[in-house]
Structures are given as C-alpha cells and as structure tokens.
Amino acid sequence: MTVQTAQIVKNYIGGEWVESISTKMEAVYNPATGEVIAQVPLSTKVDVEQAVLAANEAFKSWSKTAVPKRARILFKYQQLLVDNWEDLAKLITIENGKSYNEAYGEVLRGIECVEFAAGAPTLMMGKQLPDIATGIESGMYRYPIGVIGGITPFNFPMMVPCWMFPLAIACGNTFVLKPSERTPLLAAKLVELAEEAGLPKGVLNIVNGAHDVVNGLLEHKLVKAISFVGSQPVAEYVYKKGTENLKRVQALAGAKNHSIVLSDANLELATKQIISAAFGSAGERCMAASVVTVQEEIADQLVGRLVEEANKIVIGNGLDEDVFLGPVIRDNHKERTIGYIDSGVEQGATLVRDGREDTAVKGAGYFVGPTIFDHVTQEMKIWQDEIFAPVLSIVRVKSLDEAIEIANESRFANGACIYTDSGASVRQFRETIESGMLGVNVGVPAPMAFFPFSGWKDSFYGDLHANGTDGVEFYTRKKMLTSRWEK
C-alpha cells in the first residue's frame, strides 16, 4: 500500500468524500522521518452540522433495520479488516510510528472489537416478567439512542475507533467520528472498508479537525452521546461540556500505571513484562507501565535486569523488521519528554538509563530512547504526571502495604499489576488497590472487548465504561411496557 505524499484528507459525510468548508490545514507527519505525508483539514462547526444532519437522517432507517442484518454487515466488515490487515498495520506504523509488530497487534485488537460488536445483538435482548400481578405482565426493551459522537486519540488509531462505532451501529445508532488530526489516514481506511461491507450512507461519518469539531459535537442538540479517549484535561472538559448539554458521556482519560514487584516474584518474567509494557508503543498508551514499586531486597537485581534489557532494544523506523521502539508522535512531544527527563535529574532521581543519548534521538525522526529512573519519590514530576513516553520510574519499598499505599496516592487509576507467587498477596492487592484494571504477572492488564475498559479516579469520567455490557448499556436506552390482558 502506498501513501500519497501530502495528500489532502477529506471528510466523509452522508456516504460521500467531501472537502471541508475550512481552508485551514494541518500537516500529518511520519514521526519516524519527519516527512509530511498528508494535509488534514481543521473542519468547522458547519462541517459538523452537515455530518450530524446526515447521521440523523440515516438513523430513521438504520434504527429500524433488522438486528440480524446489522450484524451481517459487521461480520462482513470484520472479514474485510482481516483481508486488509497488512495494509492497516503498515498505515498505522507510517502515521503513528509504532513498530509493525505492535501495529499488527493493534489491528488484531480492533478486529476483536468488531467481532464483539457483531455479536452484541444477543446482549440487546430485553427482559420480561409474565405475572407481576394477576393478568398483568411487564417487560423491558432496548432501543438505540440516536446520533453518537466519537472523539479518538492518535495512539491507537484503529483499536479505539473500532471499540466505538461498530458497537454503536450494532445497537442501531449512527455515528460521527472525529479521529485525531495526527492520524487521520487510518480512520479514512476504516470507513472505506465499512462502505465496502455495505454500511448504508450516513450511518458512519468522519469530520476531521480539532477544537471546533469537538465543540461542535458537544454542543449539537441532535448528538445524544459522546465517547471520548484522550488526555485527562480534555477528558474532563468533554465530560463537563457534554453533560452540561444533556448528553450521555464516557470520557477515558490519562494514566500513571503502577507495577508492584515483590521479593518472591519471578524476576525474569517480571523484567520481560515490564520492558514490553513500559517501552512498547513508545510508552504512548494509557495502559503503559510507568512506575515500578519494588521491594528493597530485590531492587538492585531488578534494576540491573531492566537496564540490561533496555540496552538491547532496537530503536528506529517501525517498518524495519528488528525495530521494537519507534518514535513518539511529534517533535514537541519529544521535547516535552526530554523536559521530564531533565526534571527527574534536577529533582534528585537516579538516571540509570538515559534515553536522550541513543543514536536515533539525534536523527530526523521524533525518537526518545528507553529511559529508566531509580530512587524516584512521590514529590517528583516524573512520578506524578502522565509523561506518555518511554520513561520508567522505579520506587523502592519495604512491603506490599507500602507499595499499595504509594500507588493509591496517584490521582490516576487506569491499571495496576503485581508480580508475585503469593495468592495472599494477590488477594490483598485485588482488595485494596484503587485501580480499575488489574494484572497478576502480566504487564498490560487491558481486557478483551467483551469486558469493560474500566479506569477509576481521573482516568475516567462517566458512569458506563467502553466495551462489554457497559458499552451496550451506553449505546442503548430502555423502554418498559406493562400490559393487562384479561379474558
């Protein structure tokens, strides 16, 4: 698959590829080379209006389309994604920067989300009680809610859209997607394949852009719900603005995930899992391992192992076969990350592996090498903030109690992991850690699509999480019918 140089990305509204009303453009870069690969429009509220009206019109017929027919379209869509996985993975690598192997993994996760959505009609069935009183029966029915707005991030340009719009449209809704302006090409490919699968015009729409598009969706009266994934400040804004406009909102936000390594842990396993979780996708994921709390008696061993493995990581263009660590998304994010590394040094942490010194960092792309700090404390910015980069902080503790106490001080609570062979320690961890997704001897405890993606604290704003039965609840509303039938 060839990406056209500096191609102009279009919006997709009412089944047609159309140019934005706006003449303002933003460059889309290949972060591994710094080359401009496309221009994306910064669309206006007028573009949003057109897309919402098209989606609202399509809702009239799509919401009445038989549930099995909706499912058949999604099953065909799933097969098209399978047939095109190589092109999809390559496109993710080109515009996001992650390694081809990681991009392939993301494609698989996206396909899993579509598979779940295709089977979601079985979760849409209502409930009925035939005899709530003599001759009276009562039942609950599920219905779609209308036009949904989806706002997705750059770091998972396939998986996140695929956990949003397939489930929403499976439930009978129509959808307006605002992909990240940094990764619009993959979103366009997803829509092309949905069209090929037979999705009717107007059911799925794309409006590219930034703030104006977000606000247009949040303010439009015909948009009934908003699903968002992104940074904490924007998630909080989306939740407040959306709910002020009487919309149903789920806003998945930032993270600072803690991994606890106890003295009885398998250090070889823990090292392998932490390296992958901390430095995979250049640390640009909300389930990345960013803090490790380790018991003092094994801390030197673990730190030594982590540095040794980090030194083996191949950094470079994700299309190269041996590369594990690709670039961060933009030059300003690279500079921000280097600023955090500088801050860690200034605040007294021990820099045991300096990602600023890797050869690739000096080149044209936006590279930061794997960085590891030891002797980190809670007062440091590198402990407190979501860096969203390949930077790992090590905190030394005396006990599991102390490790859990430290983890619970974080305002973020997406995921947490523990490495141990003790069932009692796992139980204590499960019952006392304040985090929504937990792992035992695994580095990234992200659940499959049939379970909710359930962050806590400042990692999530809303009541119903993405995916699983929560997702079906989010995209549907209930209607109760009570009937009296007498002879």
UniProtKB/Swiss-Prot annotation:
Keyword Oxidoreductase: yes
Xref: Pfam families: Aldedh
Assigned EC number: 1.2.1.27
Binding site for NAD(+): F154, K178, E181, R182, S231, E386
Enzyme's top EC category: oxidoreductase
UniProt record, GO biological process: inositol catabolic process; thymine catabolic process; valine catabolic process
Reactions catalysed: 3-oxopropanoate + NAD(+) + CoA + H2O = hydrogencarbonate + acetyl-CoA + NADH + H(+); 2-methyl-3-oxopropanoate + NAD(+) + CoA + H2O = propanoyl-CoA + hydrogencarbonate + NADH + H(+)
The protein's annotated pathway: Polyol metabolism; myo-inositol degradation into acetyl-CoA; acetyl-CoA from myo-inositol: step 7/7
Residues the record marks as active site: C286 (nucleophile)
GO molecular function, one term: methylmalonate-semialdehyde dehydrogenase (acylating, NAD) activity
Keywords: NAD, Oxidoreductase, Plasmid
SUPFAM superfamilies xrefs: ALDH-like
HAMAP family linked: IolA (MF_01670)
Assembly and oligomerization: Homotetramer.
Functional note: Catalyzes the oxidation of malonate semialdehyde (MSA) and methylmalonate semialdehyde (MMSA) into acetyl-CoA and propanoyl-CoA, respectively. Is involved in a myo-inositol catabolic pathway. Bicarbonate, and not CO2, is the end-product of the enzymatic reaction.
PANTHER family, sorted: MALONATE-SEMIALDEHYDE DEHYDROGENASE (PTHR43866:SF4)
Family, similarity comment: Belongs to the aldehyde dehydrogenase family. IolA subfamily.
Protein name: Malonate-semialdehyde dehydrogenase 3
Phylogenetic placement of the source organism: Bacteria, Bacillati, Bacillota, Bacilli, Bacillales
